[in-house]
Design a protein with these regions (language model features):
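Catalytic-site microenvironment of enzymes
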Residues: 2-166
Length: 166
């Protein structure tokens, strides 16, 4: 419950960076069953990786990452909708088979201007903190949105660390 309270604080701070006209995509990471078939990691790339990895599990709670990500994603969806935002959910159930590439295509097709992919990554027992990833300025497929993505990502990380103390 503390996490959800902190998420609400974060949300209140960061939503000022977006207009209510923008559509937000929430992609709760992973799913009940991984898909170890491979796909390219980006358009035109020769590098491949599994379509969807299995994810991790909480050390204390034993809760699977895919389940936690969906629970948080649904609460975030409801909070954003209550503030007037249009929200697209990549998944609303754990029993899906959606590859990483398919998730990106779904988001683009939905016309989302903000893409939030939720994960609870694993680390050593002393690991604490948060990670925010954004596209590279060198990526030709995301060059037009890279600066705004970077600014938004940094704001999320800043507000998250203020709200959680990490």
């Amino acid at each position: 419950m503390k996490l959800l309270f902190k998420l609400a604080i974060l949300l209140s701070s960061v939503t000022g960076l977006m207009s209510a006209a923008e559509k937000v995509c929430i992609d709760p990471g992973h799913q009940a069953k991984g898909n170890m078939q491979t796909e390219e990691i980006a358009p035109g790339s020769s590098k491949r990786k599994p379509k969807v990895a299995y994810g991790t599990r909480g050390v204390a709670t034993k809760k699977p990452e895919y389940q936690l990500a969906l629970e948080i994603g649904l609460k975030l969806r409801d909070a954003l909708k209550a503030k007037g935002y249009s929200v697209f959910m990549v998944r609303e159930t754990n029993n899906v088979n959606i590859s990483n590439k398919e998730r990106a295509l779904m988001t683009n097709k939905a016309g989302c201007s903000v893409y939030l992919r939720l994960h609870a990554d694993a680390g050593g027992s002393s690991a604490r903190g948060a990670t925010v990833l954004t596209s590279s300025a060198k990526n030709p497929h995301t060059r037009s949105v890279q600066k705004s993505s970077d600014r938004f990502s940094r704001a999320i990380l800043s507000e998250y660390t203020k709200a959680t103390g990490f």
